[in-house]
Amino acid sequence: MSTSLNYKSFSKEQQTMDNLEKQLICPICLEMFTKPVVILPCQHNLCRKCASDIFQASNPYLPTRGGTTVASGGRFRCPSCRHEVVLDRHGVYGLQRNLLVENIIDIYKQESTRPEKKLDQPMCEEHEEERINIYCLNCEVPTCSLCKVFGAHKDCQVAPLTHVFQRQKSELSDGIAVLVGSNDRVQGVISQLEDTCKTIEECCRKQKQDLCEKFDHLYSILEERKTEMTQAITRTQEEKLEHVRTLIRKYSDHLENVSKLVESGIQFMDEPEMAVFLQNAKTLLQKITEASKAFQMEKIEQGYEIMNNFTVNLNREEKIIREIDFSREEEDEDDEGEVDEEGEGEDAVEVEEAENVQVASSGEEETLEKAAEPSELAAEIQAASGPLLASSPDSVSSLPPAADVLVTQGEVVPTDSQQTTQSETSGPSAAETADPLFYPSWYKGQSRKMISNPPHTPGGEGLSQIGPSAAEDSSVQSAEVAEAAANEQAAVSGKESSSTAATSQIGFEASSPQGQAAALGSGGGADSEPARHVFSFSWLNSLNE
């Protein structure tokens, strides 16, 4: 405890000496006063040499001898308070010396040159003759042995000063090291923050530059557009003004000509001689008539001078400009997601179109296979009727030539007419050019209707089908096959000759007008009544070849 007091007293003495030294500094040379020290009327002190220098500087025209002023009298200002000091005939030597300050300077110099006192071993405050040699662990203060035996620390735990000194010194060293390390880390963080500040400034400067460039680009676009639109208005203005000025010149010329003609007429009206008047009146009247008829007053349409077509509405653009803002990362991500969704949607549409094309192609193949079945059926019937044709060649030769036919649902359609239907030509069909006994009028009408309005079959556009829906195809074809087989058996057994078959067929086709009318009625109402099955034997002609 006494050690701390001694340290405090020493520190206080040092502070007192420092304050005293500040008071002993000359305001001119800024050093400690040198003897002799003079006191001014304002109670400030100066070195006599400094006072002489400042006096000489204030009075440069006074003669000097050996660095001192010879002439008497003069004045100068105090450097501390700027008070004017008036000197008598003795000059600066007439100022009084400050002996007190000189004595204080001597004492200060003696004390400052004295060697410093070494601090002795601290003594106990309660026992002045006892040195402090132990440390109380409970009270955490150094003390003496008598305090431990008889004094206030007799019930406390104590330890030698050396052990406690080493322990606390090591703790203090560790604490200092921790502080130094933390200071290093803090300094590193400060450096990083300074770098971050520089980076922020650089990025902001770059962004400002980019923003200014973009706005300058917008300004240039606006200026360019403004110039173009202004030029358009100017061109229209010049055109309209030129047109109006042309009309003005035209009307002015006409007015001038008419005025001259009127003046001539008025002068001619004063002609006293009737003969002269009549001689020239016809010519003048003709000129007046021509002038009144030839001139056509061209008027400017109403609103010609109004330029409403150049009105500009910038409300939408102004709204867009006011909504200009910085782009955000979320908006960019949303835009990328929309683009990805659009790409996936397009891929899905392409896949679906490819599947539809495959389905359509498979449907066309199935339809072509179904269309080939009647052709195969006709070939079988033709092969089976060979013996019948061999037994009656005359009847075959008597038959008129006809085109090959294709047995379809409800009717016999020539293959030539099928090709005609696909190409949509206007030429006559085989049914129209054949014998009327073989092809009655109602069949020709139906064939013509079939050619002009071919029914649409999905997947098989080249096929001609008239009659019930495709669901009834199988039943109708099976009935045709059964009937053809029965006719074939009858022909082979000889129950009917070929001529009789041909005659009956011709008779069947050449029916009464009532039958034809009924057939036409049935052809007209194909939606409500199934078509008749008509078989032609024109395929017999091919066997002669």
UniProtKB/Swiss-Prot annotation:
Record CDD domains: Bbox2_MuRF2_C-II, RING-HC_MuRF2
Q: Which GO terms describe its molecular function?
A: identical protein binding; protein-macromolecule adaptor activity; ubiquitin protein ligase activity; zinc ion binding
What is an annotated GO biological process for this record, any one? Answer: leukocyte migration involved in inflammatory response
Residue ranges with Acidic residues bias: 328-355
- Record's catalysed reaction(s): S-ubiquitinyl-[E2 ubiquitin-conjugating enzyme]-L-cysteine + [acceptor protein]-L-lysine = [E2 ubiquitin-conjugating enzyme]-L-cysteine + N(6)-ubiquitinyl-[acceptor protein]-L-lysine
After translation, how is this protein modified?
Answer: Targeted for degradation through the proteasomal and lysosomal pathways in the presence of SUMO3.
Task: Give, as residue ranges, the zinc fingers classified B box-type.
Answer: 119-161
Would the keyword Amino-acid biosynthesis turn up in this protein's UniProt record? no
Q: Does the keyword Metal-binding apply?
A: yes
Signal peptide start-end: none
Residue ranges annotated as compositionally biased, kind Polar residues, are 495-506
Top-level class of the enzyme under EC nomenclature? transferase
Q: Which residues form the COS domain?
A: 269-327
Question: Which residue stretches, if any, does this entry annotate as coiled coil?
Answer: 219-258
Where would you find this protein in the cell? Nucleus; Cytoplasm
Assembly and partners are described as:
Homooligomer and heterooligomer. Interacts with titin/TTN. Interacts with myosins. Interacts with SQSTM1 and NBR1. Probably interacts with TRIM63 and TRIM54.
Q: Return the protein name.
A: Tripartite motif-containing protein 55
Q: From which organism does this entry originate?
A: Rattus norvegicus
